[in-house]
């Protein structure tokens, strides 16, 4: 699913401009302001000739008296158009970044689950924050500097040609050499910029993992290891940044050297060809001033090239992400709740074209009944639970909901029918009320409280200083494991979907809490089709059907008592837990 093919610069520019196009009126105003700014600068250079010639050679007192007014008007106008141009270009850039960030985030949210299995949160954050910001530099700072300086270069060259085209042509001979230097550094900076982006993703990833897993890091004494790993990543990032800096230095120094040679050639020509080329002192000094002024914009343009290449590398990374296919979301839209009858027909599944995890899985869950999945680790329990809401697409076979293949239903319609409570509870840095009402944003406070009571969460919520308006911190860090689990259960209760998936839903609770939650879940499960994955077999004894999986195949199925009477795989697992025997090979 990864797309790392290089995109040609022309296509990148064209695609990037499609994001700029909606803001073209402001962009045009900014471009015109920057052109006027450069024109004023070039005009001042031309005025140098007039100032010198009419002030000291052919004295023109009327013109001399106007010089202060010309300077005042020119500098004032220059300042105004500079501010206007800068504001317009920055406005366009930040608008592009806003749209691009929103587009990237929306795309990431709708990517298939198997993309998340490979990509890390650090890499994704780096794309949203760092790579998109590089694009901003292309569409704002780089574009502003490019327009200002390229117009200034054109203006100064025009001034030189008007004053003395013969000497100006000599200077133009240096342009091809400047092009050779810029072309070399272009390729080098673009290549290194890809490495910089990759290392930024690694730095973000390492920091994110260490911060999120700080308890494990500390209890296992991994501080030095994490610091060393982070330092290595930042050092590698620094080295790549220095490679870019070296390329910039070579670029700038080379261009300055070429320009210096050009200036020296013109001075020599003016001295040795004085009998052929007639030029006034003012004209000669104006040409020299123009050439000296050319150094700064030429230097900026060559330095700017590195910024543009970094921005294009960032754009390439972002567009590669945007080119990844989204979840297939075409199908029927269900207007009403389903009854909840689920059937797996000859289901096979493999992750990323690897070996099959599931082999010819067949079973039926009658509407309103509960089915529990048990088996060794890696037997396919979680895979089955993930296939039902189409987190992954089937490799082979069919899953039906009320007789309709789930592939023929829209994802939104299908997932509206399902609630999920998993072992790894996800809470957002928001209030308890908003966490319970996640996905049901129109729920009233009374409905939220009712759901919390059914999940036995209302009691501890009332004891908090702000009650239901208490913020839970990042991923519910301010709550205990049992409290987080109860909030997740309350969220599922409030959704009131006809299908319920319980993936180790009571694993994080103490015995007393589990007793109450189990009672609450039994009430919630009534009338709902429930798929249960549980570690403790004692919690699934009352399931209508228990399915035993081994190596992706169904080896037994029946009620709790029926499976005990078979004295097979399930009976062995149950006895191990019932009598507290330790068997490391058995993980249910």
Curated annotation (Swiss-Prot):
- All copies of domain ABC transporter, residue ranges: 342-576
Q: What is its EC number?
A: 7.5.2.6
A GO MF label: ATP hydrolysis activity
Q: Which UniProt keywords apply?
A: ATP-binding, Cell inner membrane, Cell membrane, Lipid transport, Membrane, Nucleotide-binding, Translocase, Transmembrane, Transmembrane helix, Transport
One GO CC annotation, please?
plasma membrane
What family name appears in the similarity comment? Answer: Belongs to the ABC transporter superfamily. Lipid exporter (TC 3.A.1.106) family.
Q: What is known of its domains?
A: In MsbA the ATP-binding domain (NBD) and the transmembrane domain (TMD) are fused.
Q: What is this protein's record name?
A: ATP-dependent lipid A-core flippase
Q: Which organism is it from?
A: Legionella pneumophila (strain Paris)
């Amino acid at each position: 699913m990864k797309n790392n093919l290089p995109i040609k610069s022309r296509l990148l520019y064209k695609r990037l401009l499609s994001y700029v196009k909606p803001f073209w009126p402001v962009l045009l105003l900014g471009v015109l302001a920057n052109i006027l700014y450069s024109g004023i600068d070039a005009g001042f250079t031309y005025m140098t000739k007039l100032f010198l010639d009419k002030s000291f050679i052919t004295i023109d007192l009327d013109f001399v008296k106007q010089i202060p007014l010309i300077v005042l008007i020119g500098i004032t106008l220059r300042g105004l158009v500079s501010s206007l141009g800068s504001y317009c270009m920055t406005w366009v850039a930040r608008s592009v970044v806003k749209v691009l960030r929103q587009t990237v985030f929306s795309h990431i949210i709708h990517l298939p689950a198997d993309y998340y299995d490979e990509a890390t949160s650090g890499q994704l954050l780096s794309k949203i924050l760092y790579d998109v910001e590089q694009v901003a530099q292309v569409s704002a700072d780089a574009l502003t500097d490019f327009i200002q300086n390229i117009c200034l270069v054109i203006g100064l060259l025009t001034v030189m040609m008007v004053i003395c085209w013969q000497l100006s042509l000599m200077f133009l001979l240096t342009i091809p050499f400047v092009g050779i230097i810029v072309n070399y550094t272009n390729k080098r900076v673009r290549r290194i910029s890809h490495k910089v982006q990759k290392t930024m993703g690694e730095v973000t990833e390492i920091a994110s993992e260490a911060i999120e897993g700080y308890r494990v890091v500390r209890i296992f004494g991994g501080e030095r290891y994490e610091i060393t790993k982070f330092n290595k990543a930042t050092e590698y990032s620094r080295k790549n940044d220095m490679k870019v800096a070296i390329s910039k230095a070579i670029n700038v120094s080379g261009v300055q050297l070429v320009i210096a040679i050009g200036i020296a050639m013109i001075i020599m020509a003016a001295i040795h060809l004085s009998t052929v080329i007639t030029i006034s002192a003012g004209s000669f000094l104006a040409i020299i001033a123009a050439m000296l002024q050319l150094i700064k914009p030429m230097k900026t343009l060559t330095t700017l090239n590195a910024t543009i290449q970094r921005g294009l590398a960032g754009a390439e990374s972002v567009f590669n992400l945007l080119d990844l296919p989204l979840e297939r979301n075409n199908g029927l839209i269900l207007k009403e709740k389903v009854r909840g009858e689920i059937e797996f027909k000859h289901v096979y599944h493999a992750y990323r074209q690897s070996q099959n995890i599931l082999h010819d899985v067949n079973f039926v869950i009658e509407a309103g009944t509960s089915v529990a999945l048990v088996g060794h680790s890696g037997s396919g329990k979680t895979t089955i639970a993930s296939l039902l809401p189409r987190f992954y697409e089937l490799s082979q076979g069919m899953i039906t909901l009320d007789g309709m293949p789930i592939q023929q239903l829209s994802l939104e319609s299908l997932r509206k029918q399902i609630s999920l409570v998993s072992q790894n509870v996800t809470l957002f840095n928001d209030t308890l009320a908003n966490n319970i009402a996640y996905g049901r944003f129109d729920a009233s406070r009374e409905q939220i409280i009712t759901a919390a009571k059914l999940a036995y969460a209302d009691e501890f919520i009332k004891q908090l200083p702000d009650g239901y308006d208490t913020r839970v911190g990042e991923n519910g860090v301010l709550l205990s494991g049992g409290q987080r689990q109860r909030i997740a259960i309350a969220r599922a209760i409030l959704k009131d979907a006809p299908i319920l998936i319980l993936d180790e839903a009571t694993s994080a609770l103490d015995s007393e809490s589990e007793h109450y939650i189990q009672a609450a879940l039994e009430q919630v499960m009534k009338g709902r089709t429930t798929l249960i994955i549980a570690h403790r077999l004692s919690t699934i004894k009352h399931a209508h059907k228990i399915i035993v999986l081994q190596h992706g195949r169904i080896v037994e199925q029946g009620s709790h008592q029926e499976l005990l009477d078979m004295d097979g795989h399930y009976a062995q697992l149950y006895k191990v837990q019932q009598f507290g025997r330790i068997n490391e090979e058995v993980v249910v």
